[in-house]
């Protein structure tokens, strides 16, 4: 029996322990996200106590038009798988096991209809995990832009978030041509989707993943 089948997946809150885990293990340590569903992966640790070894975060889509574009029938029922990270010392199939269990939970316990996720080629990710979980591959996005503030990357929309203190501060520094703030061109991302309600109409044709 595979080791991962003994792992436990739990839905929880976006709490301090989750934030701390993301800061340590995710390549983007930006944790100011509005989580809709937070899942943790546990294994038996020392003295039989559960040890957190993974976090998976679902949010509403970051781009305002993404939900409408990929699921126009009911854009309010779209989630984005925004964060997925595990500790380094996990079996090869641990990530796909984790994601598949979160999908199963969403199907059983919620009325969400559609999941969207992106594999970031900037980080060498091409969506192997999503393909293993039977996500649909829809090709690539256009090349994008990201905001770098003092070496830390933020979504480009941060510049227009004038209702938030950090948005106001970053916008002010940008207008003052602060050298600590840069706009960086990014590679296209791979687009993956999953239909939680199978009978729903799929607007976009699935594509074959091409290795490059």
Regions found by a protein language model. Name each.
Residues 36, 187-192:
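Short hydrophobic/aromatic beta-strand or adjacent loop that forms the aromatic wall/cage
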Residues 11-12, 59-179:
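Acyl-donor binding region in acyl/amide transferases
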Residues 204-212:
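Short, cationic low-complexity segments
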Residues 193-198:
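Short beta-strand-to-coil "C-cap" segments at the C-terminal boundary of structured domains/repeats
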Residues 22, 35-60:
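Conserved beta-hairpin
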Residues 27-28, 44-46, 86:
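Short beta-turn/strand-loop junction motif enriched in small, turn-promoting residues
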Residues 1-33:
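Short amphipathic alpha-helix that is part of the acyltransferase structural core
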Residues 176, 186-187:
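Class I (Rossmann-like) S-adenosyl-L-methionine-dependent methyltransferase catalytic domain
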């Amino acid at each position: 029996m595979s080791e991962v089948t003994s792992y436990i997946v739990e839905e929880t809150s976006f709490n301090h322990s989750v934030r701390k885990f993301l800061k340590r293990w995710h390549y983007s340590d930006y944790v100011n996200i509005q989580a809709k569903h937070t899942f943790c992966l546990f294994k038996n640790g020392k003295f039989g106590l559960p040890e957190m070894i993974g976090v998976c975060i679902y949010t509403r889509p970051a781009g305002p038009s993404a939900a409408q574009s990929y699921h126009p029938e009911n854009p309010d029922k779209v989630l984005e798988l925004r964060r997925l990270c595990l500790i380094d010392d996990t079996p090869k199939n641990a990530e796909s096991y984790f994601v598949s269990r979160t999908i199963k939970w969403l199907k059983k316990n919620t009325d969400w209809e559609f999941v969207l996720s992106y594999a970031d080629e900037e980080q060498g990710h091409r969506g192997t995990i999503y393909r293993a979980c039977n996500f649909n591959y829809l090709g690539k996005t256009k090349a994008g832009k990201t905001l770098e503030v003092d070496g830390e990357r933020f979504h480009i929309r941060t510049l227009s978030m004038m209702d938030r203190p950090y948005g106001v501060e970053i916008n002010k520094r940008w207008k003052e041509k602060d050298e600590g703030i840069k706009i960086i061109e990014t590679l296209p991302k791979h687009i993956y989707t999953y239909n939680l309600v199978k009978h729903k109409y799929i607007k976009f044709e699935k594509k074959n993943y091409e290795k490059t």
